[in-house]
Amino acid sequence: MYGIEYTTILTFLISIILLNYILKSTTQMMDYIIYRFLLITVTLFALTKAQNYGINLPITGSMDTAYANSTKEETFMTSTLCLYYPVEASNQINDGEWKDTLSQMFLTKGWPTGSVYFKEYTNIVDFSVDPQLYCDYNLVLMKYDQNLELDMSELADLILNEWLCNPMDITLYYYQQTGESNKWISMGSSCTVKVCPLNTQTLGIGCQTTQCGSFEIVAENEKLAIVDVVDGINHKINLTTTTCTIRNCKKLGPRENVAVIQVGGSNILDITADPTTNPQIERIMRVNWKEWWKVFYTIVDYINQIVQVMSKRSRSLNSAGFYYRV
């Protein structure tokens, strides 16, 4: 009898010890699960509060906003300056070390060696087809040429403003411009753009939709053409598609990290007269021209004043980047 009682008591004690062990193990497991859950929750919460670059959001405004550089106090962070100049300049200077000389001069104005880049282009027309603006600040030097005044004006309008563009299928659709900020921009090796305005019955106004020869020529043999037609009227468009593309574009606002330096000429190009240029901030400047060395000396001397009317951007840009953005 005593043996049975001892066995019962021993079994009871073992059960208590086993239960206690199970409870402790369960508690530890629950603590592990809870802490892991809290860690994951806090991590996800932080991520949801951060900017998500993986979501393809629709564009509702300018993507070229000037961003504050959060690391601007670090000594290894510096602004970059791109100086675009015609090949004529380097040919006239004819000095293999002229860029190094200018870099040393920029250093005296607070621009460290290696922060200034010299970009050469053949001519204004070719440069307008693919203006690659990669630096925080971009200065484009254009020597005035009376025969290229229209090209200079259109190039200035193109690079001094941000454009949101969509491709156009002119073989299937008619197009109309909805306001002053809406333009058609054509680019290519040779662009000839013809338009035929249509009435409400889609009949040509002063032209025949079946005869391209009766269309109005708005651009002929150009590499860059910013086409402006009467707003609110459908147009049938004819274009040399083998050598040119055309896009339906809206001017969103100024591209404030770009400035144009007009070299020479009696008058300065003025695109601020365009009512679509808003705000009316002048970022086209003129310097006198006698020799290219004199031009570069002037730019070095006034570089910091020039940059003051600009805003630094945090991303690079090329024509493909902003032309195909939809």
Curated annotation (Swiss-Prot):
Gene3D superfamilies in the cross-refs: Glycoprotein VP7, domain 1, Rotavirus outer-layer protein VP7, domain 2
Subunit structure and binding partners: Homotrimer; disulfide-linked. 2 Ca(2+) ions bound at each subunit interface in the trimer hold the trimer together. Interacts with the intermediate capsid protein VP6. Interacts with the outer capsid protein VP5*.
Entry PTM: N-glycosylated. The N-terminus is blocked possibly by pyroglutamic acid.
Region GPR motif, residue ranges: 253-255
Protein name, per record: Outer capsid glycoprotein VP7
Function recorded in the entry: Calcium-binding protein that interacts with rotavirus cell receptors once the initial attachment by VP4 has been achieved. Rotavirus attachment and entry into the host cell probably involves multiple sequential contacts between the outer capsid proteins VP4 and VP7, and the cell receptors. Following entry into the host cell, low intracellular or intravesicular Ca(2+) concentration probably causes the calcium-stabilized VP7 trimers to dissociate from the virion. This step is probably necessary for the membrane-disrupting entry step and the release of VP4, which is locked onto the virion by VP7.
Region feature (CNP motif): 165-167
Main location: virion
HAMAP family per UniProt: Rota_VP7, Rota_VP7_A
Family indicated by similarity: Belongs to the rotavirus VP7 family.
Pfam hit, one: VP7
S-S bridge residues: 82-135, 165-249, 191-244, 196-207
Residues bearing carbohydrate: 69, 238
Signal found in the keyword field: yes
Signal sequence extent: 1-50
Other facts: Some rotavirus strains are neuraminidase-sensitive and require sialic acid to attach to the cell surface. Some rotavirus strains are integrin-dependent. Some rotavirus strains depend on ganglioside for their entry into the host cell. Hsp70 also seems to be involved in the entry of some strains. In group A rotaviruses, VP7 defines the G serotype.
Cellular component aspect of the GO annotation: host cell endoplasmic reticulum lumen; T=13 icosahedral viral capsid; viral outer capsid
GO terms, molecular function: metal ion binding
